[in-house]
Amino acid sequence: MLDSGMINKIQKAREYASEPERIHFRSLEVEFDGKNGEHHVDFREGHWHCDCDYFRGHHTCSHTMAMERVLGIMAPAEVA
């Protein structure tokens, strides 16, 4: 049985979820199971980072692009 406090929290969660512009990523860190092994992908200080060889030379890779697709509209935007 839900009490009134929990009902209010659920309603507040729905409100937040309907206004994604109120949510701001400061950091995000994941372990990505790639075809050639695991890769560490993170978003910090306004930029994506990956430990794969391709990212080192191009500042983007399939792992960071996949994270942007998975997160959809919630993907953090890189700063200039």
Where are the regions that the model predicts?
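Long, low-complexity, compositionally biased intrinsically disordered regions
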Residues: 1-80
